[in-house]
């Protein structure tokens, strides 16, 4: 099975959206294999968002991500990266379709509730930044046989 990294950002945590977001992924049939709340250290924010280091918005992004607890997760499922990206919607909540996480819960591009890996390669890198292999759990959901065609 494929894996992806998902992070509910401080605005999503502080607005009480964790349960609703997790429920959407579970209802889709995805499997949560790791999760924890954490205020990210600066070093991991820099590593996570290395592609944005030279951009003018990076200092405010870093401050925002470090401004409260995030909920870090690893989800598993077939084509999970693409599925989660569709479920979260466009980066700018004002452009995100209704029914997507950002379309329903996001307000501003600078406070867009959630981050998810954009490729399998990014997923592997981001999971490695935030989780040790021993923190990823293997188990079978009781509904896997009806979620996936084998």
Curated annotation (Swiss-Prot):
SMART domains: NDK (SM00562). It catalyses: a 2'-deoxyribonucleoside 5'-diphosphate + ATP = a 2'-deoxyribonucleoside 5'-triphosphate + ADP; a ribonucleoside 5'-diphosphate + ATP = a ribonucleoside 5'-triphosphate + ADP. It is found in: Cytoplasm. The active site is at 115 (pros-phosphohistidine intermediate). Pfam families: NDK (PF00334). It comes from the Archaea. Its main location: cytoplasm. Its EC number is 2.7.4.6. One of its GO terms (molecular function) is ATP binding. Keywords: ATP-binding, Cytoplasm, Kinase, Magnesium, Metal-binding, Nucleotide metabolism, Nucleotide-binding, Phosphoprotein, Transferase. ATP binds at residues 9, 57, 85, 91, 102, 112. Its cofactor is Mg(2+). GO terms for cellular component: cytoplasm. One of its GO terms (biological process) is UTP biosynthetic process. Gene3D superfamilies: Nucleoside diphosphate kinase-like domain (3.30.70.141). It is an enzyme of class 2 (transferase). Belongs to the NDK family. Major role in the synthesis of nucleoside triphosphates other than ATP. The ATP gamma phosphate is transferred to the NDP beta phosphate via a ping-pong mechanism, using a phosphorylated active-site intermediate. This is Nucleoside diphosphate kinase.
